[in-house]
């Protein structure tokens, strides 16, 4: 069924509820519906339609009050957009509803999609949208007591525009009290079978939480009865920052959304921007992008591998693997000039060409790693203690993973071979030979094995990049390429004007909505951009995999021991900046 046929079927089924179809530059059909039909439409798409849209990929809000280019769209003060995916169809659909700007209210779709509540809480936190039947109408990224909703267009975009903050003693006490592990506030039970449960603050300053993050637990002895993750301690307002940076200047921020993913964070953003501009990136630049992205996949997975072993009691592996990461970072630094946050990609290509001797450095790393991985397999994967701590622990199946929006290794460990690089090839991945590692049990052990095998596949991809690196330019010959090719800067008055505009004011993208999707180290990362014909983004929505993966803790943790929770958290492989943005 094509996208147009899907919209037709939806319009036929809900004649009075479907208001219009929005034409976007994406391949995703976008349909506006009446707010009172929200639950029925989402239930139809998830449960009743052939090859259903099982996964809620994202849900976000848009403040439309300052938007100028809205021709043909229904009147809206605040828009709620939900992004659904059908893996069987390899297709997505977006559903939008228009709300009042002053008092935005919508129906919760938590009864249809189990992972909707956190996204709805974020829409309330950032935009003030209240959802009916939302079980926990709490702020999620901002601290309790925060005044206002910062993503609204009436809210300041810089700290210097806000009133001076003064932490009085009474305010400090109030904030401390608000952070207490109150079971009623978190919806936790206090008794089971007549026995009082212990409420435990697990984090935020715990080595096992891998970042500033806490889980409020209800315990019966060592058994977890209920768990409520509490996030937001690392929130920096990345989406708000995008609204006050030019399209080009926001690039370094994308490296830091997932600070272990490096240049991979730049890929979905650039994919969306280049789609908006109609830029065709040269083959050499695309191949370099793939090579560096896979290098960072290896760097991340080595860190995961070592810390996962450490979380389950093995001390030595993490030191060996940090030695390997140091070798890898030397290669990355030699090529890009930086280690963890290179900011190496540009709109239309790369910041610079590969240096002399780059291939020798990469080949040395490729020759070094395989034997090391063989050693680690005996040290970790075949270790009886590691196997006892991970096999059968925190297991879930494919259906549960799709329900909670799990992507990446967490989904593939259940036996489902879904990888954006294969299903929806980008940047030239269709030209590379590699396999998708999968597990079968969906437990901590399989999630580890999948990532280890991904290291081997990344080595295979990188070797193909080195052996088949195209020649040619590293930047597109396009007026919106930023910065423009230097050799064209003084060619004539026209190129000089383009250079001046791009480097001073910044490139202006055509009005519209554009999306980039990439298989990053943790799963599906998606940038949904709205351009209003300005040098900066009108709305940048960043969908990260870690956000969805942590929400699932409340469904997986009950029934396991506290010690098993350590292994489960390690196997998720999340980064708190990726969660909180």
UniProtKB/Swiss-Prot annotation:
Cell compartment(s), UniProt: Cell inner membrane
PROSITE patterns in the cross-refs: COMPLEX1_49K (PS00535)
One Pfam family of this chain: Complex1_49kDa
Lineage start: Bacteria, Pseudomonadati, Pseudomonadota, Alphaproteobacteria, Hyphomicrobiales
Predominant subcellular localization, coarse grouping: membrane
Subunit description: NDH-1 is composed of 13 different subunits. Subunits NuoB, CD, E, F, and G constitute the peripheral sector of the complex.
Role, per record: NDH-1 shuttles electrons from NADH, via FMN and iron-sulfur (Fe-S) centers, to quinones in the respiratory chain. The immediate electron acceptor for the enzyme in this species is believed to be ubiquinone. Couples the redox reaction to proton translocation (for every two electrons transferred, four hydrogen ions are translocated across the cytoplasmic membrane), and thus conserves the redox energy in a proton gradient.
EC numbers, comma separated: 7.1.1.-
NCBIfam families xref list: NuoD, PRK06075.1, PRK11742.1
Stretches for region NADH dehydrogenase I subunit C: 1-172
Bilayer topology annotation: Peripheral membrane protein
Catalytic activity: a quinone + NADH + 5 H(+)(in) = a quinol + NAD(+) + 4 H(+)(out)
Keyword Cytoplasm on entry: no
GO cellular component terms, semicolon-separated: NADH dehydrogenase complex; plasma membrane
Natural source organism: Rhodopseudomonas palustris (strain TIE-1)
Alphabetized UniProt keyword annotations: Cell inner membrane, Cell membrane, Membrane, Multifunctional enzyme, NAD, Quinone, Translocase, Transport, Ubiquinone
GO MF terms, alphabetically ordered: NAD binding; NADH dehydrogenase (ubiquinone) activity; NADH:ubiquinone reductase (non-electrogenic) activity; quinone binding
HAMAP family listed in its UniProt record: NDH1_NuoCD_1, NDH1_NuoD
Family statement: In the N-terminal section; belongs to the complex I 30 kDa subunit family.
UniProt-recorded name of the protein: NADH-quinone oxidoreductase subunit C/D
Region: NADH dehydrogenase I subunit D, residue numbers: 196-581
